[in-house]
Amino acid sequence: MPVINTHQNIAAFLDMLAVSEGTANHPLTKNRGYDVIVTGLDGKPEIFTDYSDHPFAHGRPAKVFNHRGEKSTASGRYQQLYLFWPHYRKQLALPDFSPLSQDRLAIQLIRERGALDDIR
């Protein structure tokens, strides 16, 4: 379950996202997927423990995830990309990359796609 207190259908949708992203039941997660970093081409799963900022916020190189050299910074329960993190951190006044901040960001993305009312 997400940590945010929200409508039960929104909570269920967030759970579905976490399952589909492979984070909810990730073999290393210690926090329901909120601590999962995208697995790179090397196949080594990884988690993070510092929620003060997005794991890729301070210059950590993105992970190569295929043989074409494509890279990802996907992190957290909903595999949120660093590319969008600074914008949403400011817009939503998110203090950190904690589970609550990740939930709030995910709900904002759903809202922006016009799907929030459909989920309720």
Task: Name every feature range the model reports, one short phrase each.
Residues 1-95, 104-119:
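Cell-wall polysaccharide-cleaving catalytic domain and substrate-binding groove, primarily
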